[in-house]
Amino acid sequence: MASEFKKKLFWRAVVAEFLAMILFIFISIGSALGFHYPIKSNQTTGAVQDNVKVSLAFGLSIATLAQSVGHISGAHLNPAVTLGLLLSCQISVLRAIMYIIAQCVGAIVATAILSGITSSLPDNSLGLNALAPGVNSGQGLGIEIIGTLQLVLCVLATTDRRRRDLGGSGPLAIGFSVALGHLLAIDYTGCGINPARSFGSSVITHNFQDHWIFWVGPFIGAALAVLIYDFILAPRSSDLTDRVKVWTSGQVEEYDLDADDINSRVEMKPK
């Protein structure tokens, strides 16, 4: 873990997460806040159209940034995704901690910038996640779990280097998954499925009501996605010792893509 801490590539990846998170939050939430303007000038703009625009803004921004910085940091841009990849033994504990810090700080910075730019908007929530009227905490938690589960499951499947059947764009597939999560959850919770995104809005607005839902739900969803994919759908043969080595070293060998049996389980070992 100490050796990884000293590497320039490690810190470059952390900075990439920070900068990409700023762009992601600014673009996606900025798009949502922009609804105040067309609604006033164009009365035909409805809630359904608004939800689609928000969903596309979040999904396409993730796809774009994943393509832009994915080769540098992996473009997690979400603590739930980072937790999922940690539990899947693809990153070290140190990297996970630093990524989550970078993501949260990036979200705060972006939301603060948006707060200044959109200060004239009435009732400006800055994209604050909140339970819709009639939705209780248990229901909101369930929505966040399901929305995040499908996202992390998509990330694990799309980035699985054992697969030879993948075609098209991985970042675009993940972006569509983010958009799908928003289409599902936006009417119930405002769609968190990203604790850092929720945290930034709560910090700047000083509103932490029901905020725990937007951490606990995504983290449970991420853990369930790893359980389903790594232990049921596409299990890997790695014991506890190997997993601990990956968590501490952060270095994982490439999958054996030349294996005769591509359906065989692949063991992940640190270098």
UniProtKB/Swiss-Prot annotation:
Regions that span the bilayer: 12-29, 49-67, 93-111, 136-155, 166-183, 209-226
Location(s) in or outside the cell: Cell membrane
Keyword Phosphoprotein listed: yes
Record field: catalytic activity: H2O(in) = H2O(out); nitric oxide(out) = nitric oxide(in); CO2(out) = CO2(in); glycerol(in) = glycerol(out)
GO BP terms: ammonium transmembrane transport; carbon dioxide transmembrane transport; carbon dioxide transport; cell volume homeostasis; cellular homeostasis; cellular hyperosmotic response; cellular response to cAMP; cellular response to copper ion
Highest rank taxon of the organism: Eukaryota
Residues that bear Phosphoserine: 249, 264
Modified residues (Phosphotyrosine): 255
GO cellular component, one term: brush border
Motif NPA 2: chain residues: 194-196
Main location: membrane
Subunit-structure text: Homotetramer; each monomer provides an independent water pore. Component of the ankyrin-1 complex in the erythrocyte, composed of ANK1, RHCE, RHAG, SLC4A1, EPB42, GYPA, GYPB and AQP1. Interacts with EPHB2; involved in endolymph production in the inner ear. Identified in a complex with STOM. Interacts (via the N-terminal) with ANK1 (via ANK 1-5 repeats). Interacts (via the C-terminal) with EPB42.
Similarity field: Belongs to the MIP/aquaporin (TC 1.A.8) family.
Domains as described in the record: Aquaporins contain two tandem repeats each containing three membrane-spanning domains and a pore-forming loop with the signature motif Asn-Pro-Ala (NPA).
Name this polypeptide is given: Aquaporin-1
